Amino acid sequence: MYDIQSRWKLESNILRYYGLRNQPNMFKNTVKLTKKQKTIVEKLPCDLTDDEISILKNLVGAEIVKFESKKLIPSSLDDAKFCKTCIANDFMIPGIEFDAEGRCPICQSTDKTKDLKSIVPIMNTFPRSKKSRFDVAVFYTGGKDSTYLLYYLSKVLKLSVLALTWEIPYMSESAKKSIENAKRSLDSVEFISRKVSNDDLRKIYNKLYALSENTCACPSLAYVLFYPELVANKVPYFVAGNEPAQLLGLYFNHMAPRIAYTFPDSKGLIFLFNVGRAFTLRPPLKKGQFHTLATMKQLAYGDSKIKNMAGYSNELVYNVCEAIKEAPNILNPLKRAIRASSRSGNIPAFVQVDFDEISGGAYEWQKIKDVIIRECGWVAPEESDKGLHTSCKIEKCKEHSQFARFYHMRSTMIPFSALEIAIASRSNNLSREKAMEELKKSLGFSLDEIPECAIMREYIER
C-alpha cells in the first residue's frame, strides 16, 4: 500500500511540503502534478498498479512512499530528533530534515546566510536632526530588545529619542514596570503611549483570531497608530529593534528572499524608483524612506500583488491587514500621513541597528539583560531565564497557535519562535544549554492548549 509521505499534502494540483528541507532543496516545497498524477494521488492510501507507478514517475520513493516507509512525526519534545549544532528539532519544526552529519538546514546554511543582516538599511550612528526635536524614534514595548535599543540610542549615542508605546491589553506586569523605570532612567527620551478603543480592538482581534487563531498584531498596529505622529514631528529616523535571530528567521520562513537583504544597499533600484517620483514632482527618496512607504502602504492598502505572485507573502502581516479592515476609521489618519509625507518628502527613514555589532560582535542575551537592568531598571519576566519576546502575557499563546497550525498543516508559516530560538543557539546569542532550558520551560510548543490562550480569549469575548 502506498501513501503520501509525511508532511506532504495534496492541495489542488500540487503537492506541498510543510517543513524545512535540506540544502539545496530548502525552498523547493511544491511539486506540480499532471491530471493523471493528481487522480492517482487523490485516492491514496491504496495499492498501486505498475501503470500507476509509471505515471507517478519520480514521485514514487520521495513524495509517494510505501505506507511502512512513512516518516514518524514526534508528538512531544521527548521523542524529537535534535540538530547536532543548534536546538532545532522535528517536534517544534515538524518536517525539518537533517543531513548525514546531523545538521539542520539552518546550520547547513551558516556560510550562505552570514551576510543576511536586515531587510531595511542598517545604521548604527545617527546625525543630529536640524528639523525636529527628535533625532530618532523607536517603538518601545518594555521588552529586552526595545529596552536595549532605547538605552543604546539615548545613553550611548546621546540622541534625543521619541519612544512610542502601544498599550496592548496583554502587556505583562514586568513590561509595565520596565517602561516606568525607563522613564525615570533615560533623561533624553520623550515617551508617548496610545491605546486603541476596546470596541475597535475587539473587532480587529476577533477577525485576526478567526484568521490566525491568535490576536498578535504587533508591531503592525503600532505602525498604524504612530506613523502620523512621526510625520507630524518630522522625525528623520524610525529605528527598528529586531534582534538578529528575528531578522534571519524571515529568510528561513520564506518570507524574505536573499535579494531583500541586499535591496537596502541597491542604489540602482532606488534611482529607478526616484525617476518615477520625479515625473510626479515628488522629492527623491533617501536611504530607508522607500522601506517606510512600502511598509505603511501595505498596512493601509493591503499586500503587494507582485510579492504574492513571487511566493513571498507574509501570512502574518496579510492577516493583520485583513483584520484592521474591521475598524476602517483607524486607517484614515495613516492614509493622510502617507499622502502628506510622500508629497513633501518628510518621511522617517525605516532603519535597523545591528545588535551584534553594537554589542561587541554577538548579541548575548544574558549580557544584554545585565546592561539594561543596571542602566534602565529593566524588570525581567516571571520566567527570568526567558529571552525571546519578553513583554507580552500571551506570547506562549502565539507560539502555541502558530505551532499547532503548522503541525497540523493548516499554515505554511513555521512558528517564529521555533526558528528564532534555533538561530539564536546557533549564533551564540545564548548557549545550547540555555536555549534548551528556555525551549522546555518558557515556549508554547504544545499540542494541547495552554493556559495563556484563556487570557487571550477573555479579552475578545467580553
Descriptions of predicted regions:
Residues 1-42, 77-80:
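Acidic, low-complexity/disordered tracts enriched in E/D and polar residues
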Residues 6-10, 56, 96:
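Short, exposed beta-strand/loop patches in secreted or surface proteins that constitute
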Residues 13-15, 64-65, 104:
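Hydrophobic residues embedded in beta-strands of well-ordered beta-sheets
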Residues 36-56:
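Short acidic, hydrophobic short linear motifs in intrinsically disordered regions
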Residues 52-76:
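A short, conserved structural fragment
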Residues 78-101, 105-136, 152, 156-462:
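Nucleotide-activated chemistry modules centered on ATP-dependent adenylation/adenylyltransferase
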Residues 136-145:
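Short, glycine-rich nucleotide/cofactor-binding loops
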Residues 148-149:
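Hydrophobic positions on the alpha1 helix immediately C-terminal to the Walker A/P-loop
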